[in-house]
Every structure is written in structure tokens, then in C-alpha cells.
Design a protein with these regions (language model features):
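Conserved short-loop catalytic and cofactor-binding motifs
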Residues: 31, 76, 106, 160-163, ...
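Residues lining hydrophobic/aromatic ligand-binding pockets adjacent to catalytic sites
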Residues: 9, 65, 71, 163-164, ...
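Active-site acidic/histidine proton-transfer and metal-coordination neighborhood
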Residues: 33-125, 181
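Alpha-helix-loop-beta-strand connector modules within alpha/beta enzyme cores
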Residues: 14-28, 81-92, 120-121, 172-178
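Histidine-acidic metal/acid-base catalytic patches
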Residues: 60, 112-127, 133-206
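Active-site beta-loop-alpha junctions enriched in small/polar residues
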Residues: 1-4, 26-28, 66-68, 104-106, ...
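Conserved, mostly hydrophobic/aromatic
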Residues: 24, 43, 54, 99, ...
């Protein structure tokens, strides 16, 4: 997560580790679909700064697709998103990296909440967030799509709790089957270390 106390300012921090990395771009204060052009441009610039660091360590980037404040602004915000998308695609090509948009939670001002929104991403891949899809009651439909990466966590279908596997209502048997079929990468996005360890054991037993 490239923000707050985890803001990445120097890719050298990764040199001590042998893991493969996926960087989640900053999202607080960011809106690549903003109707305020200065905010949209600044948000894109922050994403491109993230691309520059990610390219140094060979990591793909996950980002949020933006949001709109009022339903009457949705079409205009979609056009702003499309403008940002083209700029981000050009920058990703310049940096020789992949980036993916994450499907968002249940709040209706978010862009990209259901599989119906996938065409708006063009030829850019996406990160299937299982918990967010569960909140929007469309996880089975998402599992039938061609996703590139997956965020794994559980919830009760009402709150984006990022709970450990088994603490919510998601059936992870079809989730793991879809992950294997897609050949996608995945990360556990559980709120604490104990939950990560429990989740890892349960997923390995499936």
C-alpha cells in the first residue's frame, strides 16, 4: 500500500527481500474520474509517480477507478475516467509495467462495482476483490470473468471488514477454482497477521 506510513519514496527498500511484489497505488484524496480537471490531473500524476517506483522493482500496480459525487454527474465522470485511462495506459507502456483496476465496494458512487463495468476498462486488466464483489452480490458472476489478480478476504455481505477466511459468508471453493483457472496472482487482504495465518491455512486445505 503506497500511502500513509507505507508511502514508498525509494525502491531500494525492496532490495532486502526476495518476494514478488504488487503495489497498491495511493487512493486517499485521489480521484482519476474527478470533474475537477486539476484534481484529475494531479491524481493521474500520483499514479504515474507510483508507476515509476513499481517499474524499478518489476511490480504491477493496483489502483482504484475513481468515483462521482452525484448520480447526475456519472456520465461526465465516465468521460474523465476515460481520459485518465488513456494517459495511464501510455505511461504504463513507457514504464513497461502492468496495472489493474480494482472492483469497488457497495457504495454507489464508486466506479467499477460489477462485471457490467468491465468494458469501460478497455484492454486494461483488473484485480478481482472477492470481498467487494460479495458486498455487491455479484461474486459468482465475477468468477466467470478473465481477471488478472485477486484480493482475497471475507465479509458478511454487508460490511467491508476484510475478515479472515471463514469469518464471513464467502464460499472459497469456487473462488480458488476460478483463481487456478485464471492463472492469476493473488494476495490476502486481511486486517491482521493472525487472520492472515488462519486464512492461509484454510486456503491451503481447500
Amino acid at each position: 500500500m503506497d500511502e500513509g506510513p507505507h508511502l514508498i519514496t525509494d525502491p531500494a527498500v525492496f532490495e532486502s527481500y526476495s518476494q514478488d511484489f504488487v503495489i497498491h497505488a495511493p487512493y486517499h484524496g485521489m480521484n482519476i474520474a474527478s470533474l475537477f480537471e486539476s484534481i484529475r490531473r494531479a491524481s493521474v500524476e500520483v499514479m504515474i509517480d507510483c508507476f515509476a517506483i513499481a517499474s524499478e522493482i518489476g511490480a504491477p500496480v493496483v489502483m482504484h477507478p475513481g468515483y462521482h459525487a452525484w448520480n447526475t454527474e456519472k456520465e461526465a465522470a465516465d468521460r474523465q475516467f476515460e481520459k485518465s485511462l488513456h494517459q495511464l495506459q501510455e505511461s504504463a507502456a513507457d514504464h513497461s509495467l502492468m496495472f489493474w483496476f480494482e472492483n469497488m465496494g457497495e457504495l454507489n458512487y464508486f466506479h467499477f462495482r460489477t462485471p457490467d463495468d468491465i468494458p469501460s476498462l478497455g484492454d486494461t486488466g483488473f484485480c478481482l476483490d472477492c470481498g467487494h464483489a460479495n458486498l455487491n452480490h455479484c461474486l459468482p458472476a465475477f468468477l466467470e470473468t478473465d481477471f488478472s489478480h485477486m484480493h482475497i478476504h471475507d465479509n458478511d455481505g454487508r460490511t467491508d471488514s476484510h475478515s479472515a477466511i471463514g469469518e464471513g459468508t464467502i464460499d472459497f471453493h469456487p473462488v480458488m477454482a476460478a483463481l487456478e483457472r485464471a492463472g492469476a496472482t493473488a494476495v490476502l487482504e486481511v486486517k491482521d497477521l493472525e487472520g492472515v495465518l488462519v486464512s492461509k491455512r484454510l486456503l491451503e486445505s481447500l
